Each structure stands twice: as structure tokens, then as C-alpha cells.
Amino acid sequence: MSKNKFNLKLPPGSIEQTNDHDNHTGTETPQRKASTGATGSFGAMSLESLLKCIQELDMDDTQRKRMEIFLVQKQKIGELNADDFEKLGELGAGNGGVVNKERHKPSGLIMARKLIHLEVKPAVRNQIIRELKVLHECNSPFIVGFYGAFYRQGEISICMEYMDGGSLDLCLKKAIRIPEPILAKICSTVLKGLAYLREKHQIIHRDVKPSNILVNSRGEIKICDFGVSGQLIDSMANTFVGTRSYMSGEVPVERLTTSLYYYIEPERLNGDHYSVASDIWSLGLSLVEMAIGMYPIPPPDPNTLKKIFGSKIEGVSPSPTSRSPRSAGLPGEPRPMAIFELLDYIVNEPPPRLPPGVFTPEFVDLVDRCLKKSPSERADLTTLQNHEWIKRAEQEDVDIAGWVCKTMDITPSTPTKPSADANC
């Protein structure tokens, strides 16, 4: 088995170079297919092997049934080709690419198709496709399903499970703030997804943020866009400038674009290597943003917090060392920070905190454990999964599906319970 730069195992024979055809799909050519067996839809693993793997995972019967249905559908689809897709609309853009809602005409399935324009050499492009094949083995109720990837006319296409509720950054725009009971369920699921990637595949996400957490009308919460392809990350870092992101890839500061700064952790700016602790920082910052309804660096001042939360706010005063720039004409609201001003703030100023008196002490404690400046002091995945806030969330019956459908104005795919707003 060969390995890529993230130490991920690749299928046997995947290092073989393919011809420079414009519609390379990243799956086996007919000649190679005959020698390796019918594994085109699943990389190096058969359907039977994948079904056996999901039997070993911790999930309920409903989740297991949905996983089995997804894998069977995926086998029927087979190889993907650009001509088989019909664009239905655009879902979002960022990180150098656009995500469309598309119908796979032969099967009738609706998919999310991410298109990334890359001007790279054929060998680099083929390496990206090979590295993305690892996603065939990433099957979990907490990870967005992967149908396949291919290349055509300067674009890498990554075809994924369609989540009709969209990403949490879009939900946040509609909801203004996300209620704590919903956030607790989100956090619990994200932790399970990160633990699955780490324990089963030795993968670190590298880009935890609201736009990479997706929801649907069935109440499912799944993470996407994790750093499985080192070559793709490097190629995008070298190519794109100026789109907002929360990614913390292992690239030098001089190569970071504007998009890569917002959720970067302090130790990365000091030259340390990326680790699971980096994902924990990004998760903590995401929780604060979704809870208060605004990016928390620089932190909002007391007047802004009182406008947001009213009389719930207890005594809040700015940190004596805090430098929180304000916009002229918009009292209390942080002005956008220049990139190096933001980086300096992340490294040298206190980390964000949830405002006192608004949220439960357990939620505040979990966020504080995520946002320790020193990664050695930051809580790890196991500690967070055993945290009181998470354990309580797993016991509570919160209607995620109802909240998603109400927030995004979509039709429930299953009957919903009383709105989660009642718990907020």
C-alpha cells in the first residue's frame, strides 16, 4: 500500500500514471478494472467490506439502515462522468470552488457537486484524484457521503451527498443565532465525526467551521471538506486568493490567503505543526460565533452584547489588555480587521469567551476548554466527548429536523416534533 503526504493508505496500483485524457475520472480504466475487480464505486474496498465496516461502528439502527441504503445506491451508480450531470442550482462558493446542486441523470439522484478550477500538471491532477479515493472508505453517519471525483476541462469535481438544509453558516444567517440546545447536538455530532476520522483513518479535519457542517430535513448533522488530499490543499493554497475560510492548513504564512486566517489557531501562527488540537480550537471558535451570531474576533463590547441579549447579560467589561477596534459611525460593532492585525490579535490577545449570564455554565466551560491558547492545555476529543454538556445533550430529545426546516423554510422529510425554540 502506498501513502500520501498525510500518511493515508492508497489502493494498490494507485501510483500508476494514467494518460492525460481531458475526462479522467479517477476510477479504474477498463484495462486496470479487469485486473483489480469491480471496485470502481468504492476505491479499493468492495460493497461487502464497507457494509461489514459500518456494522462495527457505534450508531443506531436508523443510522445504520441509511448508511446501507447509501452504499447500495452508490454501487449502482458506478463511475461518474461530467456528461451525466444536470445543474439545478448553486449551493455556495468558497475555498476556490463552487458547489452546485445537480441531478445525476442515469440514477436520478440529487448530489452536491463541488467544482474546483485548478491549472495544474497532469501528474498533480492525477495524484489529487488518487488521494480523494480515500473518501470512499470514510463512511459514517457523521460524515457527508462521497460518490466519487473526476477531472474535466480544468476542473476537479467532487460529488457528495446532498444535504437539503445547507451549511450552518447559511442557517446562522437566517436564524441570527443558533440556540444552545441545537448547538449542543451539533457539537456532539462534530466530535463524533472528528473522532471517527482520527481513530479509523488517521485523518485530521484541518478546516472546521460553520460552512463545513451540514444539516438536512431529517435532522442529520454531518461534517465535510476535511483535509484528505494534501496535493489538493497545496494546489489551492498556491492558486486562490481572497475567499473567506476557516482553514488551518500546513502552509507558510506568506502563502496563506485572506481566506485562511479567520479560525487559525495561535500555535500555527507561531510555526507549530497542525494537530487534532487545532481542530478543537476551530470548533470552539465556531461555537462562539454561532451562539452570539457574529465572528468573535475582536470581541463585541458590552453595549453590543446588551443589544443582542438584552437583560440576560451580566456585568461585562473589556479586558484591560484587549484591543477591540470599532467602526466609526457604528458604536459597539467591531470593524473588519486587516489580516496582520487579525493575526496579531489571535496570537497576543485573550481568546474569545461566551458572555456571562446567557448560557449554561457547562457550555461556557466547554468553550473555554476548547479555546486555550496553548494546545497542550486544550481539551482533547475524548475529554470533550465525556464533558457534562455533551453527555447531557446526548440524553436530551431536541428536534433538529424541525429547527432546520423552520429556519431554512423547507418541507420536513419526516414528521417533526414541537419546535426546538421551545427549549431555548
Q: What does each model-found stretch correspond to?
A:
Residues M1-G78:
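Intrinsically disordered, low-complexity regulatory segments that flank or precede the catalytic domain
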